[in-house]
Amino acid sequence: MATRRIISQEKTLLEKDDRIGSSPAASEKSNITPAVPASVIIKLLAFTFAMIVIPISSYFLTVDRLFKGNSTYAGATAAIMANVVLIGYIIVAMAEDQSDQENEKKGGGGKGEGKKDL
């Protein structure tokens, strides 16, 4: 069954609140800080670059100089180097996560909790 709208109780478009959903009002400043810290993005880009460059360069450096044309051993070396880079990334990520947890335990409150929105 349909209900009737009472037009006298409805607000016009100009009378409605400036807030639409979760967006801030026009008079408030929005928080534009990135969700991920810049140091995390830099580490990710560095390890991405290393994941591309190190295995390929290790293959081409070892195929002729170390293994004398045997591409199987050179490919295995490249795979091992890719795993070394991956393990290095995991170790760095775990160390960063542990340092964040220690900061929270000490009462630091994390990296971004000390800041207040203006």
Curated annotation (Swiss-Prot):
The chain crosses the membrane at residues 36-56, 74-94. This is Vacuolar ATPase assembly integral membrane protein vma-21. Coiled coil: none annotated. The gene is vma-21. It comes from the Eukaryota. The lineage of its organism: Eukaryota, Fungi, Dikarya, Ascomycota, Pezizomycotina. Residues 102-118 have a biased composition (Basic and acidic residues). It is found in: Endoplasmic reticulum membrane; Endoplasmic reticulum-Golgi intermediate compartment membrane; Cytoplasmic vesicle, COPII-coated vesicle membrane. One of its GO terms (cellular component) is endoplasmic reticulum membrane. PANTHER family: VACUOLAR ATPASE ASSEMBLY INTEGRAL MEMBRANE PROTEIN VMA21. Residues 57-73 are lumenal. One of its GO terms (biological process) is vacuolar proton-transporting V-type ATPase complex assembly. It comes from Neurospora crassa (strain ATCC 24698 / 74-OR23-1A / CBS 708.71 / DSM 1257 / FGSC 987). A motif (Prevents secretion from ER) lies at residues 115-118. Residues 1-35, 95-118 are cytoplasmic. It is a multi-pass membrane protein. Residues 98-118 are annotated as: Disordered. Keywords: Cytoplasmic vesicle, Endoplasmic reticulum, Membrane, Transmembrane, Transmembrane helix. Belongs to the VMA21 family. Its main location: endoplasmic reticulum. Required for the assembly of the V0 complex of the vacuolar ATPase (V-ATPase) in the endoplasmic reticulum.
